């Protein structure tokens, strides 16, 4: 059994993820477990942003890693391994949405179902984050979450969402301004 070194980066370095995908392609199940451990939060976060339902997001997260196991030999290390993983996730989410044609808003109970240790936020911070994110448009929210949660660069987000880079940049900066204004407004009310 191969042991993989732990990484201090959130989802692992690109080189480390590429090594894991190569090991998965060679049939090493422990590499899949390591990849899952390093990337599950980002994959789950993206699926939740598309599906707005914790049960469906959990299903898709599981499906992503089954897909990775089945298709790792097809991964070409010329691109970002995290980008490939999130593209798989996005495609599975879009297929699910086409099947169910469901675009619901994430309920408070579903926000509460996200494990607190996964986010590292207190209940109060999670509530505030939920409020601020709910005021953003769908695409703005997805771009902010992809950048903040997965650490993807804006050009990677543009490729993943199939949007022009200037559009991603403007939507990201607009979303940050909206969030800042909301937070400053909340702080003004507290004083």
Regions found by a protein language model. Give the residues of each.
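C-terminal edge and immediately downstream basic/flexible tail or linker adjoining helix-turn-helix-like DNA-binding
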Residues: 1-12, 23, 109, 122, ...
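Arg/Lys-rich amphipathic alpha helix in sigma70-family domain 2
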Residues: 70-77, 86-107
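Short, basic/polar amphipathic helix motif occurring as a linker/hinge flanking DNA-binding modules
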Residues: 96-120, 124, 190
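Short helix-capping/turn signature of helix-turn-helix
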Residues: 37-41, 49-52, 135, 145-152
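DNA-recognition helix of helix-turn-helix
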Residues: 90, 94, 140, 149, ...
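Structural recognition of an alpha-helix C-terminal capping motif at a helix-to-coil junction
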Residues: 45, 59-66, 79-91, 170
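Short, charged helix-capping/linker segments at alpha-helix termini
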Residues: 2-11, 25-34, 44-63, 156, ...
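Conserved RNAP core-binding helix
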Residues: 16, 37-40, 44, 54-71, ...
